[in-house]
């Protein structure tokens, strides 16, 4: 996923090795006041800035194909994009078995996301949340699942979190030449 254009993202120790929805995770984004890239801790599960009460359902994914049309995602897509660095992601195959997709060499990679700033009316505290953008699966992942996170090339990190309002051409299925899908994790059954 080569490239050396984003030193701050590549040199960080804050890479998601295991994350679950509602968990606070390290995310890179552009500071709206300074325009500079910053790292922060955001909660996985998007709460749109315009809602009055905490919704019961907080999406963890946003489809690239409809992100510019859906009210819940379009403002964040235009103004508040982020990158989640991870070493792999989990998908369930057709049999319900968990599969892990990672780089062959174990290197971290950046996934496109969007973030929001929401003020809780009960506590008056601000909460930053995010969702990961998904695209149709590439040919490596398609036998396991029909969707995958939008993996960014390192050279595109700055553009993704930059001020451009529609970098939609970056939301494509990653070719996957350097990705590997783990075999299904099975339970060992020992017979006497």
Where are these regions (language model features)?
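Short linear sequence motif anchored by a di-proline
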Residues: 1-192
């Amino acid at each position: 996923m080569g490239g050396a254009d984003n030193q701050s993202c590549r040199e960080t120790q804050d890479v998601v090795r295991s994350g679950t929805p509602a968990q606070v995770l390290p995310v890179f984004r552009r500071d709206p006041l300074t325009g500079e890239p910053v790292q922060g801790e955001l909660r996985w599960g998007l709460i749109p800035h315009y809602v009055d009460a905490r919704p019961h359902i907080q999406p963890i994914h946003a489809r690239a194909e409809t992100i510019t049309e859906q009210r819940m995602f379009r403002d964040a897509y235009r103004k508040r994009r982020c990158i989640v660095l991870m070493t792999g992601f989990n998908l369930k195959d057709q049999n319900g078995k968990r599969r892990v997709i990672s780089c062959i060499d174990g290197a971290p990679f950046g996934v496109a996301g969007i973030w929001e700033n929401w003020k809780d009316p009960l506590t008056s505290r601000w909460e930053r949340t995010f969702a990961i953008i998904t695209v149709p699966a590439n040919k490596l992942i398609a036998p396991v699942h029909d969707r995958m996170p939008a993996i960014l090339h390192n050279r595109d990190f700055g553009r993704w979190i930059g001020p451009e309002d529609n970098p939609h051409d970056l939301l494509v299925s990653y070719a996957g030449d350097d990705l590997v899908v783990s075999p299904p994790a099975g339970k060992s059954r020992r017979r006497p």
